Amino acid sequence: MLASANDIALQIAEQIGGSVDGFVQMMNNRAVELGCTNTVFTNPTGLPDENQHTTAHDMALITKAAIDNESFRAIAETTSYTIPATNVSGGERVLTNNFSMLNNTNASYYQYCLGGREGYTEASGSTLVCGAEKNGVSLIAVILQGASGTTAAEAVSLLNYGFDNFQLLSLGDNDFDIAYG
């Protein structure tokens, strides 16, 4: 999540799934478990494939599950990480999270952002998915087929609208009649 690294995504897939295809099957099974109804993965990188597809709703379900996972959330919120030197690398390496909404020197920085990912391919245009939390309310924004350079601003607008116009309500047992069948 810190740096775009499709080679690492493939290595992780092989390690966890036994093969890339095995991991992709795990991805598709998990998507179904999460309630996704129009998502088919064909690779762990997210790179275009004519048989791979999803919807904004399904991406929101996947993002919610990811952000609810404390380990994932800790990684997604990390802005940089230093990999110590090894006998192969010869020196330490710094990985920087390139998600603009987490970078406080970027115009797209959003203080309530929990993490996310943005990308671009010719097939899908600009895309972004992120989670944010403010005053105990958690929201997810998904932008698909966006115009280049606008997805973070669009996500901020959506999140601000949600935070400004919706609130959590607690309904007690006596606040409404319950019909039993």
Label every model-predicted segment.
Residues 1-57, 61-70, 134:
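Active-site-adjacent loops and short helices of periplasmic peptidoglycan-processing enzymes
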Residues 36-37, 51-53, 57-58, 63-181:
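Domain-terminus/edge residues, biased toward the C-terminal soluble/receptor-binding domains
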